[in-house]
Swiss-Prot record:
Pfam families assigned to the protein according to its UniProt record, in alphabetical order: Antimicrobial_2 (PF08023)
GO biological process terms held by the UniProt record: defense response to Gram-negative bacterium; defense response to Gram-positive bacterium; hemolysis in another organism
Descriptive protein name: Esculentin-1
Primary location recorded for the protein, binned into one broad class: secreted
Organism: Pelophylax lessonae (Pool frog)
Amino acid sequence: GIFSKLGRKKIKNLLISGLKNVGKEVGMDVVRTGIDIAGCKIKGEC
């Protein structure tokens, strides 16, 4: 009925927001690593 539809929507939204948060954190790690590598290459410290 109505409740199961609402429940499914809520679970879906939670999953989506969870994935977005994980994506953000992974993205930040990748960006940081990329900056570190770029920085050490510029300085010639790799």
